Amino acid sequence: MHGEADRPSETQRLKAHEMKSTLLLLALCATAQAAPPASFFRALHVVETGGRTGAIIGDQGRALGPLQIHRAYHADSRVAGDYSRVADLDYSKRVVSAYLQRYAPAAWAAGDVVTLARIHNGGPRGASKPATVAYGDKVARLAK
């Protein structure tokens, strides 16, 4: 038979509960920071500039860099740094990540490539615009 000594104390039970709560919180935080697959950024890069890098000017002079970022998009991303830095692919990825996490957190967490691509292309409400359907599908095909 088990005696009193075999039962966990109140302190042990509280510590176990705290540990479970902490692990749950960490799991939730990890999920919130989930990201689309790396293939999403490669596909976006190919669709936007054919995979070229540098200070590529597009959209009649309104977009810059390998991911074709507009000034307003850069500002909306809230990433520190001068707009000219979007010519750098790594910086552009940070800008796109911040923008999409701001305007499409659920799609970001789910890795919803189509929705993310459509918002990248059409702005915060881009996922509901018929004009972005083909763009989203193209990025999704290339991301597979």
Label each region the model flagged:
Residues A34-K144:
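Catalytic glycan-binding domains that act on GlcNAc-containing polysaccharides
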Residues K20-S21, V96:
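A short alpha-helix capping/helix-coil boundary motif
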Residues S21-T31:
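Sec-dependent N-terminal signal peptides
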Residues A5, Q33-A34:
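Compositionally biased, intrinsically disordered/low-complexity regions enriched for serine, proline
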Residues E4-E18:
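Short, Lys/Arg-enriched N-terminal segments with co-localized hydrophobic residues
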Residues D6-S9, L24, S39:
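Residue-level detector of alpha-helix boundary/anchor positions
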Residues K15-A16, C29, R141:
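Short hotspots in intrinsically disordered terminal tails
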